[in-house]
Amino acid sequence: AFVPGGSSVPVLPANLIYKTANGDDRLMSYESLSDGGFATGSMLGSGGFIVYDDRACIVRNTWNFARFYHHESCGQCTPCREGTGWLEKVLWRIENGQGRDEDIDLLWSIQSKIEGNTICPLGDAASWPVAAAIRHFRDEFEYHVRFPEKVKNRNHFVNEPFSKVLTSNV
Protein backbone atom coordinates (compact mmCIF):
# COMPACT_ATOMS: atom_id res chain seq x y z
CA ALA A 1 0.00 0.00 0.00
CA PHE A 2 1.08 3.56 -0.59
CA VAL A 3 0.13 6.94 0.88
CA PRO A 4 1.35 9.56 -1.62
CA GLY A 5 1.30 12.63 0.53
CA GLY A 6 1.19 12.24 4.27
CA SER A 7 -1.48 11.09 6.68
CA SER A 8 -4.31 13.19 5.28
CA VAL A 9 -4.52 11.62 1.83
CA PRO A 10 -6.21 8.36 0.86
CA VAL A 11 -4.09 5.21 0.94
CA LEU A 12 -3.84 3.28 -2.33
CA PRO A 13 -3.61 -0.50 -2.54
CA ALA A 14 -0.78 -2.06 -4.53
CA ASN A 15 -2.93 -2.61 -7.63
CA LEU A 16 -3.62 1.14 -7.93
CA ILE A 17 -0.08 2.40 -7.33
CA TYR A 18 1.29 1.90 -10.83
CA LYS A 19 -1.95 1.83 -12.82
CA THR A 20 -5.17 3.79 -12.60
CA ALA A 21 -8.50 1.97 -12.41
CA ASN A 22 -8.70 2.49 -16.21
CA GLY A 23 -5.36 0.74 -16.71
CA ASP A 24 -3.42 3.89 -17.58
CA ASP A 25 0.05 4.36 -16.13
CA ARG A 26 -0.13 6.27 -12.86
CA LEU A 27 2.38 9.08 -12.61
CA MET A 28 3.37 10.92 -9.46
CA SER A 29 1.47 14.02 -10.55
CA TYR A 30 -1.59 15.75 -9.16
CA GLU A 31 -3.63 14.81 -12.22
CA SER A 32 -2.65 11.15 -12.35
CA LEU A 33 -3.07 10.57 -8.63
CA SER A 34 -6.52 12.15 -8.63
CA ASP A 35 -7.73 9.95 -11.51
CA GLY A 36 -10.93 8.25 -10.40
CA GLY A 37 -11.50 10.57 -7.48
CA PHE A 38 -11.01 9.10 -4.04
CA ALA A 39 -12.70 5.85 -5.05
CA THR A 40 -9.62 4.77 -6.99
CA GLY A 41 -7.23 7.67 -6.57
CA SER A 42 -5.55 9.86 -4.02
CA MET A 43 -3.63 13.12 -4.11
CA LEU A 44 -0.23 14.57 -3.47
CA GLY A 45 -0.14 16.19 -0.09
CA SER A 46 2.72 17.35 2.09
CA GLY A 47 5.36 15.66 -0.03
CA GLY A 48 5.82 12.86 2.48
CA PHE A 49 5.32 9.36 1.15
CA ILE A 50 4.37 6.35 3.26
CA VAL A 51 4.93 2.88 1.83
CA TYR A 52 3.57 -0.22 3.55
CA ASP A 53 4.57 -3.79 2.85
CA ASP A 54 2.26 -6.72 3.57
CA ARG A 55 3.49 -6.89 7.17
CA ALA A 56 2.06 -3.47 8.02
CA CYS A 57 -1.30 -3.35 9.77
CA ILE A 58 -3.58 -0.93 7.92
CA VAL A 59 -6.01 -0.87 10.85
CA ARG A 60 -3.26 0.13 13.30
CA ASN A 61 -1.92 2.78 10.95
CA THR A 62 -5.40 4.20 10.37
CA TRP A 63 -5.95 4.28 14.14
CA ASN A 64 -2.66 6.19 14.56
CA PHE A 65 -3.80 8.73 11.98
CA ALA A 66 -7.16 9.06 13.76
CA ARG A 67 -5.42 9.61 17.12
CA PHE A 68 -3.37 12.40 15.57
CA TYR A 69 -6.39 14.16 14.06
CA HIS A 70 -8.42 13.79 17.26
CA HIS A 71 -5.56 15.38 19.21
CA GLU A 72 -5.18 18.18 16.65
CA SER A 73 -8.88 19.06 16.48
CA CYS A 74 -9.50 22.48 18.01
CA GLY A 75 -12.99 21.39 19.03
CA GLN A 76 -14.74 24.39 17.49
CA CYS A 77 -17.09 22.43 15.24
CA THR A 78 -19.08 19.43 16.37
CA PRO A 79 -18.45 17.03 13.44
CA CYS A 80 -14.69 17.27 13.92
CA ARG A 81 -14.66 17.45 17.73
CA GLU A 82 -16.99 14.49 18.19
CA GLY A 83 -16.28 12.62 14.97
CA THR A 84 -12.51 12.40 15.33
CA GLY A 85 -12.97 11.12 18.87
CA TRP A 86 -15.36 8.44 17.69
CA LEU A 87 -13.05 7.43 14.83
CA GLU A 88 -10.22 7.01 17.31
CA LYS A 89 -12.34 5.02 19.79
CA VAL A 90 -13.81 2.63 17.23
CA LEU A 91 -10.48 2.07 15.49
CA TRP A 92 -8.83 1.40 18.87
CA ARG A 93 -11.53 -1.15 19.64
CA ILE A 94 -11.01 -2.95 16.32
CA GLU A 95 -7.20 -2.86 16.58
CA ASN A 96 -7.24 -4.19 20.13
CA GLY A 97 -9.43 -7.21 19.45
CA GLN A 98 -12.67 -5.74 20.76
CA GLY A 99 -14.24 -4.86 17.43
CA ARG A 100 -17.83 -5.71 16.59
CA ASP A 101 -19.31 -6.62 13.21
CA GLU A 102 -21.10 -3.28 12.95
CA ASP A 103 -17.97 -1.22 13.74
CA ILE A 104 -16.72 -1.11 10.16
CA ASP A 105 -19.99 0.36 8.90
CA LEU A 106 -20.05 2.66 11.93
CA LEU A 107 -16.62 4.00 10.94
CA TRP A 108 -17.88 4.59 7.41
CA SER A 109 -20.90 6.46 8.74
CA ILE A 110 -18.82 8.62 11.08
CA GLN A 111 -16.25 9.61 8.47
CA SER A 112 -19.00 10.48 5.97
CA LYS A 113 -20.59 12.83 8.50
CA ILE A 114 -17.27 14.61 9.10
CA GLU A 115 -16.18 15.10 5.48
CA GLY A 116 -17.36 18.41 4.07
CA ASN A 117 -19.08 19.45 7.29
CA THR A 118 -16.32 21.20 9.20
CA ILE A 119 -15.07 24.77 9.33
CA CYS A 120 -11.51 23.92 8.34
CA PRO A 121 -9.96 21.10 6.29
CA LEU A 122 -8.85 19.10 9.36
CA GLY A 123 -12.14 17.21 9.35
CA ASP A 124 -11.68 16.17 5.73
CA ALA A 125 -8.08 15.20 6.46
CA ALA A 126 -9.30 13.00 9.31
CA SER A 127 -12.02 11.30 7.30
CA TRP A 128 -10.17 10.53 4.04
CA PRO A 129 -7.66 8.00 5.43
CA VAL A 130 -10.46 6.11 7.19
CA ALA A 131 -12.66 6.03 4.09
CA ALA A 132 -9.81 4.83 1.86
CA ALA A 133 -8.67 2.21 4.36
CA ILE A 134 -12.17 0.75 4.56
CA ARG A 135 -12.74 1.03 0.81
CA HIS A 136 -9.50 -0.71 -0.16
CA PHE A 137 -8.70 -2.88 2.90
CA ARG A 138 -12.08 -3.86 4.31
CA ASP A 139 -10.91 -7.48 4.46
CA GLU A 140 -8.23 -6.48 6.98
CA PHE A 141 -10.82 -4.75 9.18
CA GLU A 142 -13.04 -7.84 8.95
CA TYR A 143 -10.08 -10.05 9.91
CA HIS A 144 -9.54 -7.96 13.04
CA VAL A 145 -13.17 -8.40 14.03
CA ARG A 146 -13.33 -12.13 13.19
CA PHE A 147 -10.02 -13.13 14.80
CA PRO A 148 -9.57 -10.86 17.85
CA GLU A 149 -7.24 -13.31 19.60
CA LYS A 150 -4.77 -13.06 16.72
CA VAL A 151 -4.66 -9.27 16.48
CA LYS A 152 -4.05 -8.73 20.20
CA ASN A 153 -0.41 -9.57 19.45
CA ARG A 154 1.08 -6.15 18.60
CA ASN A 155 3.17 -7.75 15.85
CA HIS A 156 0.36 -9.80 14.36
CA PHE A 157 1.37 -9.20 10.73
CA VAL A 158 5.14 -8.93 11.22
CA ASN A 159 5.64 -12.67 11.61
CA GLU A 160 2.80 -13.66 9.30
CA PRO A 161 1.99 -11.07 6.60
CA PHE A 162 -1.70 -10.36 6.05
CA SER A 163 -1.60 -11.64 2.47
CA LYS A 164 -0.67 -15.09 3.84
CA VAL A 165 -3.05 -14.86 6.79
CA LEU A 166 -5.94 -14.03 4.47
CA THR A 167 -5.43 -17.09 2.28
CA SER A 168 -4.95 -19.44 5.23
CA ASN A 169 -8.11 -18.33 7.07
CA VAL A 170 -10.58 -18.21 4.20
Regions found by a protein language model. Give the residues of each.
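Redox cofactor-anchoring modules in respiratory/redox and cofactor-processing assemblies
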Residues: 1-170
